From Swiss-Prot:
Subunit text: Homodimer.
Family matches, as CDD domains: PRTases_typeI
Keyword rRNA-binding: no
HAMAP family xref list: Aden_phosphoribosyltr
General function of this protein: Catalyzes a salvage reaction resulting in the formation of AMP, that is energically less costly than de novo synthesis.
One Gene Ontology biological process: adenine salvage
UniProt name for this protein: Adenine phosphoribosyltransferase
Naturally occurring in which organism (per UniProt): Rhodopirellula baltica (strain DSM 10527 / NCIMB 13988 / SH1)
């Protein structure tokens, strides 16, 4: 309750903030022809960060969320404060070799190979109401894998919340029938460049 009151006392001044002003476009990164959406200015701005968390949480405030789940690494940035805002627990979803206890695992295919996500078997109890959180929805592959992993836990998945949605990449369709909420939507002429970012060969896990 204290966390909810703290957020409530802060959110009113930021209701009309244009968060796009705090997302920086970086052309030709990480290679020529790619446009990168850099959220580090938003993260460094206290009011913008608070407003982002508030807007990501807004549709789920009355949904009685038990657990917020997020995949490494950038999902952790928003997952923990959203859990605090919703008076819920936080459960990390990680790559292999990062979690020390008994695990549920889900392997999935990527354009350049395969990957795997894992969660502790006691992280989510059957029937708990879970919200999945990430900074970005693009092609939807990682979030879809998170959904399949949470289904193995017999969780009740309430929906997914993102700061940014790259609409033209079609990720939302992969998350059907679950409710998808995003704060900022981008699309149009830069869709192919942003698709290139999401499909680049995976690097080492964080």
């Amino acid at each position: 309750m204290c966390d909810q009151l703290a957020f409530a006392s802060q959110r009113k001044p930021y209701q009309h903030m244009d968060l796009r002003h705090h997302v920086r476009d970086i052309p030709d990164y990480p290679k020529p022809g790619i446009l990168f959406r850099d959220i580090t200015p938003l993260l460094a701005h206290p009011e913008a960060l608070t407003a982002s968390v508030e807007e990501m949480a807004k549709p789920f405030l009355d949904q009685k969320i038990d657990v917020v789940a997020a995949a490494e690494a950038r999902g952790f940035i928003f997952g923990t404060p959203l859990a605090m805002r919703l008076n819920a627990g936080f459960v990390p979803i990680r790559k292999p070799g990062k979690l020390p206890f008994d695990l549920h695992s889900f392997a999935y295919e990527l354009e350049y190979g395969s990957d795997e996500l894992q969660i502790h078997v006691d992280g989510i109890k059957p029937g708990q109401r879970v919200l999945i959180v990430d900074d970005l929805l693009a092609t939807g592959g990682t979030v879809e894998a998170c959904l399949r992993l949470l289904e193995k836990c017999d969780a009740e998945i309430v929906g997914c919340s993102f700061l940014i949605h790259l609409v033209a990449l079609g990720g939302e369709a992969r998350l059907s029938p679950y409710h998808v909420h995003s704060v900022l939507e981008y699309g149009g002429d830069d869709a192919e460049d942003e698709l290139s970012i999401q499909n680049r060969p995976p690097g080492p896990s964080v």
